[in-house]
Amino acid sequence: MSNSLVISVDAMGGDDAPDMVVDGVKLARKRFPDVRFLLFGDEARIGPLVAGDSALSAVCTIRHTASAVSGDAKPSQAVRSGRQSSLWLSIEAVKKGEAAGVVSAGNTGAFMAMAKLILRTLPGIDRPAIATLLPTLRGESVVLDLGANAECNANNLVEFAIMGEVFARTVLSLDRPTVGIMNIGSESGKGTDTVRDASARLQDSALPIRFMGFVEGDDLGKGTVDVIVTDGFTGNVMLKTAEGTAKLYSQFLRNAFLSSLLARLGYLLSRSALQKVKARTDPRRYNGAMFLGLDGVAVKSHGGTDALGFSNALAVAIDLVRQGFNESIKDEIAKVQVLPSTVSVSHAV
């Protein structure tokens, strides 16, 4: 490949791979004509999809792999038996310097396990975290961790805050993003020892972070802060709840507009506004969760997305590489000294 930016792609990951993946790469090529792609997977299936588009063929190189990681494979099983899989080899391309970042719509647990093993974490980072953007009344907010770490200590949350702040500056183009820790209340005395300890460290440190204290569940939609930090268990439940609520209200609206002739007329009158709302909350627009803290750019696409959604995940990876995201995290982590724990051990709820 030339000196162009190269993105490695697990072409066999996702519900409708490789067709959806290749179609997503086609869309990404139009947005980023100077980017090249390494496609890992079954060449017999990928080749014909690429060959039909001369412009796409010019920017794609196919690397045949004999296997793919299934969606239901356990991470430990995938790591043991999947070292010749499209997922493993696409990540390995980043480690070898053949690509600047990797994108997969495959098994999340396997992707994270392999990425941690192959890429390792950045110096000073204990655990990587999964981060993504979610729509709010004010625009978008970064939320992390979304499932990589079910249990976290205070230092993990501080690291997440640092990485999330850099992520917000990079993807949202914010000069000084605001950061909050998810809690059961906004008062300083509420919550577990872990969240209060993390809050105290961020409040008392010399880190250049606009830490706003604790936020609650309803602050997610309000956009109270630009970055919401939480453990992976809470974050994953929060994300799935938000997705489920969006589907619920969408079905409520559909049922209401189908309930009578007058309601159908009401839909026709309000269709333009409803289409704007739909576009604003379209999950494909926010597809592309970043594995923060790894020594390489790794982006996870939703497995059930379509070509547009996958192209947006590719766009996230490309933007992060071009803006030197990992280098920025290294610089910020290097500023962190041992932050004192100043919170008492009593439980306030």
Swiss-Prot record:
Q: What does this protein do?
A: Catalyzes the reversible formation of acyl-phosphate (acyl-PO(4)) from acyl-[acyl-carrier-protein] (acyl-ACP). This enzyme utilizes acyl-ACP as fatty acyl donor, but not acyl-CoA.
Could you tell me the EC number(s) of this protein? 2.3.1.274
What is this protein's record name? Phosphate acyltransferase
Keywords in UniProt for this one?
A: Cytoplasm, Lipid biosynthesis, Lipid metabolism, Phospholipid biosynthesis, Phospholipid metabolism, Transferase
Please list the GO terms describing molecular function: phosphate:acyl-[acyl carrier protein] acyltransferase activity
Q: Does the keyword DNA repair apply?
A: no
Family annotation (InterPro entries): FA_synthesis, Phospholipid_synth_PlsX-like
Instruction: Spell out the PANTHER family in the cross-references.
Output: FATTY ACID/PHOSPHOLIPID SYNTHESIS PROTEIN PLSX (PTHR30100), PHOSPHATE ACYLTRANSFERASE (PTHR30100:SF1)
Annotated GO CC locations? cytoplasm
> In which family does this protein belong, per the annotation?
Belongs to the PlsX family.
Reactions that this protein is recorded to catalyse? a fatty acyl-[ACP] + phosphate = an acyl phosphate + holo-[ACP]
Enzyme class, one word? transferase
According to its UniProt entry, this protein's organism is: Rhodospirillum rubrum (strain ATCC 11170 / ATH 1.1.1 / DSM 467 / LMG 4362 / NCIMB 8255 / S1)
Q: Is Phosphoprotein tagged as a keyword?
A: no
